[in-house]
């Protein structure tokens, strides 16, 4: 996945992100590519076939390059996410998944790896209720579009607002979706308060058997793509709270575009998940 799915010299989502993480952590397990059947649990078959057939470098939207090796990279990302829910691990993958809509890619995303993993757990592992907590700085519009009408999956998104992709604003929550829009400049205290007052009671009421974290790190104070102020300690605290709310937790890498800080932020989250 490091060298698959090339995005060009000036795109923020590059293989250098994953290379830095693999060098730092030397993961013990590898996942194989997701099957077409698994991907089509969340994506339209016509869109899946279009990605599989890409024969030259192109763009799925103005932000999302794709080419002949994108199919392999996106299948591996989804397959690693599926493996993570089986073993309670953290899937270090690219490209990100949470912006991808059922019928098209967008926002750097090709396939919704977290949603694919959730449906895999339900179809193949006997899990009934799954929660997805997304702390990437961007609203997880793709994941929401996939699961909004599914009462067996709760989606929670904490994100900068207003900001790309322009969804997930105030008054957009319902029985299966909790959107928590936060203003630019929000840091550890704001996220901790949101967890205490909104995320925790909602998760306790839903009582998930599995919690999947869409772990983006672009809300970090030094990330170049956004304007939030979360620190490593803030990510550690959110991860720890997730483990307190569900006995079975897995995580999938989403955004985070400062290659120099990304390994430390993932490490902080791993410490929280292990606490």
Residues of each region from the PLM?
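HDAC/HDAC-like amidohydrolase catalytic core signature
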Residues: 1-275
């Amino acid at each position: 996945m490091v060298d698959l799915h090339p995005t060009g010299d000036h795109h923020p989502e590059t293989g250098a992100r994953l290379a830095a993480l693999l060098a730092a952590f030397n993961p013990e397990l590898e996942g194989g590519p997701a099957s077409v059947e698994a991907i089509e649990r969340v994506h339209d078959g016509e869109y899946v076939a279009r990605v599989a057939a890409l024969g030259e470098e192109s763009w799925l939207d103005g932000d999302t390059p794709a080419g002949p090796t994108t199919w392999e990279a996106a299948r591996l990302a989804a397959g690693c996410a599926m493996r993570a829910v089986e073993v309670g691990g953290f899937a270090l993958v690219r490209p990100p998944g949470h912006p991808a809509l059922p019928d098209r890619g967008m926002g750097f995303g090709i396939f919704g790896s977290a949603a694919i993993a959730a449906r895999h757990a339900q179809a193949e592992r006997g899990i009934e209720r799954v929660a997805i907590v997304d702390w990437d700085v961007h609203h997880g519009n793709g994941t929401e579009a996939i699961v909004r009408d599914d009462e067996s999956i709760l989606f929670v998104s904490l994100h900068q607002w207003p900001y790309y992709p322009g969804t997930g604003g105030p008054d957009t929550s319902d029985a299966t979706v909790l959107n928590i829009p936060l203003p630019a400049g929000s840091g550890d205290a704001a996220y901790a308060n949101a967890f205490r007052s909104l995320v925790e009671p909602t998760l306790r009421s839903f009582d998930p058997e599995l919690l999947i974290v869409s772990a983006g790190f672009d809300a970090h104070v030094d990330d170049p793509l956004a304007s939030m102020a979360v620190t490593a300690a803030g990510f550690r605290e959110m991860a720890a709270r997730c483990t307190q709310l569900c006995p079975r937790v897995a995580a999938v890498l989403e955004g985070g575009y400062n290659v120099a800080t990304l390994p430390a932020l993932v490490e902080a989250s791993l410490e929280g998940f292990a606490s």
